[in-house]
Amino acid sequence: MGSNAAAPAHNRNQTSQILQVYNHFFLIDCGEGTQMLLKKHKVKLSKIQCIFISHLHGDHYYGLIGLISTMHLYGRTESLKLYGPPGLGEIISIQLKHSNTSLNFDIDLKEWTPGVSEILYENDKIYIETFPMDHRIACSGFLFKEKPLKKKILKEKLPTDILPSQIAQLKKGNDVINGSGKVLYKCDDYTAEPRKSLSYAYCSDTKYTEDILSSIREVDLLYHEATFLEDMADRADLTFHSTASQAAKIARKAKVGKLILGHFSTRYRDLDPVLDEARKVFKESYLGVEGEDFILIE
């Protein structure tokens, strides 16, 4: 959705992303104007089940109370899961209190622990884990990782009298064994290996740090901030941000599949130099452009 840094500029908005995993929609960060972008790109607010806030700099969460208020206005009743840094709950409570707003729905808030990795969310398909960024205030990255998939059943090979419970065992990778220990159906005879589980890592505001490599190693898709070009590396270090080449260096060292660049400084109207700089280090680098999809599997 949004890909700019501190302020909107050059038809680029502040940070926000929608990640769809199966039928689950996750909003990652919520900069100013996010709800307008969701409407523009036809993402129904009712589909958003979880929101993840990386840190409490305004360009990453100033759109949150407006989005929550609109969800209320539209009659939402389903609970909203909200994950963010310490202090986010207090901010939301104050905003609702002083606007005399009593929401139609519950906010299930969990504030993550700064400086450590922890699992925030888990369902039968994926889990979502935090990992620390190196920024001026408490800031977290998020790893979205698909759980190992079950074996693919070769339906054409299944006996007609096999039971559903026995098929379930084969999917789990188990041989089907009767009460006396005899193998009735060998898993390898009736199944094929599933595709590789997919993963996405979101690296919000951070200076260059290799401490994150263990958390993002070999992910299929990596988003990493690229606020500056390399000629402003000193400025990047001073403000706890990264350059495009530094983001690409992290992608290369972590052996990721593809890199999305974002969080661009307002000083850059033309982003071609940002992309060129990154691709000199890591070929599979791409600009985070509003409305553009990065699809890992159809």
For each feature predicted by the language model, list its residue ranges.
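Conserved beta-strand hairpin/beta-sheet module of binuclear metal-dependent hydrolase folds
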Residues: 1-41, 47, 79, 142-144, ...
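Active-site neighborhood of divalent metal-dependent phosphoester bond hydrolases
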Residues: 76-113, 267
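Active-site metal-binding motif and surrounding structural segment of the metallo-beta-lactamase
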Residues: 32-83, 111-113
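Divalent metal-coordination and catalytic microenvironments
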Residues: 29, 38, 55, 82, ...
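Active-site metal-binding loops of divalent metal-dependent hydrolases
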Residues: 3-4, 33, 56, 87, ...
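Local beta-strand/beta-hairpin segments that build beta-sheet-rich folds
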Residues: 1, 115-122
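Cap/insert and terminal regions of metallo-dependent hydrolase folds
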Residues: 173-293
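Active-site-proximal loop/helix segment associated with metal-binding centers of metalloenzymes
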Residues: 10, 121-202, 206-215, 221-223
